[in-house]
């Protein structure tokens, strides 16, 4: 859930876990 919030700046790292 929180990964979605950081999906912007951390799209490379958290984007792989939660491509929301």
UniProtKB/Swiss-Prot annotation:
Optimum pH is 9.0. GO terms for molecular function: 3-dehydroquinate dehydratase activity. Optimum temperature is 76 degrees Celsius. Thermostable. The keyword Glycosyltransferase does not apply. The keyword Metal-binding does not apply. Its EC number is 4.2.1.10. GO terms for biological process: amino acid biosynthetic process; aromatic amino acid family biosynthetic process; chorismate biosynthetic process; quinate metabolic process. It is an enzyme of class 4 (lyase). This is 3-dehydroquinate dehydratase. It catalyses: 3-dehydroquinate = 3-dehydroshikimate + H2O. Belongs to the type-II 3-dehydroquinase family. It comes from the Bacteria. Homododecamer. The gene is aroQ. The record marks 17 as: Transition state stabilizer.
């Amino acid at each position: 859930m929180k990964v979605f919030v950081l999906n912007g700046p951390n799209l490379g790292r958290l984007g792989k876990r939660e491509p929301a």
